[in-house]
């Protein structure tokens, strides 16, 4: 552990997402956050390469916690998406705050400053129905209370999804359904940080988004970047690297490491 705060992301081993893990780990470290990553608990060559790129080769002291869960291959995407809500099961107790985020959402500035003794939700003003996964923050102890966690990650996910897969018709919002229902009892304790909608892109203010890349760059504020997939491609990698260079002030050594990681990832695919 390097920092007192950690962001929780999740990924399976799809190249659309897994490639981004060292990049967002690097970015969150630059602004003072550690990373907790939820992922299916199965070994493979790509997994070992990506984790070693962070732990053994990164040009900074890594602070990465991996929490695994078990699921069928059929349910892997759904379990991965929802697993972020269950990090409080095993999160390092010394963390003052853990906050949910996305593995393909690159932080561009030190925007997030949630209090340890509060539940903080960012961007609820842009969502009529759900609490957004990006971003919700609380202490590990509070997350255990909110989510009624038992200490068994897989069992807790199983229990919730047994119910929510029946009552939710859209599986892509089940994670938000779970979060919204769980926070319903705490609405009087929540600190809301409004994000506001950009007049340029209809996305949140400060968001660079892959679905409106040119328009969102008209934003003067920089908060986060929803990175283009596949991020390692010849078309998209220069875009991703440029956001890192322009917003996170990487050293030459760090840039070289990022470039080498991308090249090595392509070889191992």
Can you describe what each PLM-predicted range is?
Residues 1-73, 256, 264-269:
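N-terminal anchoring/stem segment of glycosyltransferases
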Residues 117-143:
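Short beta-strand-to-loop element that shapes/binds the nucleotide-sugar donor at the catalytic cleft/hinge
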Residues 13-15, 42-44, 71-73, 104-107, ...:
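Short, solvent-exposed loop/turn segments at secondary-structure junctions
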Residues 80-125:
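GT-A fold catalytic core of metal-dependent nucleotide-sugar glycosyltransferases
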């Amino acid at each position: 552990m390097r920092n007192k705060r950690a962001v929780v992301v999740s990924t399976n081993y799809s190249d659309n997402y897994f490639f981004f893990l060292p990049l967002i780990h690097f970015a969150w470290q630059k602004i003072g956050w550690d990373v907790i990553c939820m992922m299916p608990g199965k070994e493979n060559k790509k997994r070992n390469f990506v984790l070693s790129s962070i732990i053994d080769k990164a040009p900074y002291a890594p602070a990465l916690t991996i929490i695994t869960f078990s699921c069928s291959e059929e349910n892997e995407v759904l379990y991965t998406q929802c697993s972020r809500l269950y990090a409080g099961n095993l999160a390092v107790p010394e963390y003052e705050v853990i906050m949910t985020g996305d593995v393909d959402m690159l932080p561009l500035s030190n925007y997030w400053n949630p209090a340890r003794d509060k539940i903080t939700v960012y961007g609820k003003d842009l969502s009529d129905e759900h609490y957004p996964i990006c971003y919700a923050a609380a202490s590990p102890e509070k997350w255990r209370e909110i989510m009624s966690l038992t200490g068994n990650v897989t069992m807790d996910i199983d229990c919730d999804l047994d119910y929510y897969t029946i009552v939710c018709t859209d599986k892509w919002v089940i994670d938000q359904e779970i979060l919204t229902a769980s926070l319903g009892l705490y609405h009087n304790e929540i600190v809301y940080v409004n994000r506001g909608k950009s007049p340029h892109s209809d996305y949140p203010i400060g968001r660079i988004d892959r679905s409106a890349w040119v328009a969102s760059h008209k934003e003067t504020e920089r908060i986060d970047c929803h990175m283009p997939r596949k991020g390692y491609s010849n078309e998209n990698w220069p875009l991703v690297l440029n956001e890192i260079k322009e917003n996170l002030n990487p050293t030459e050594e760090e840039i070289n490491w990022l470039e080498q990681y991308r090249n090595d990832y392509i070889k191992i695919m």
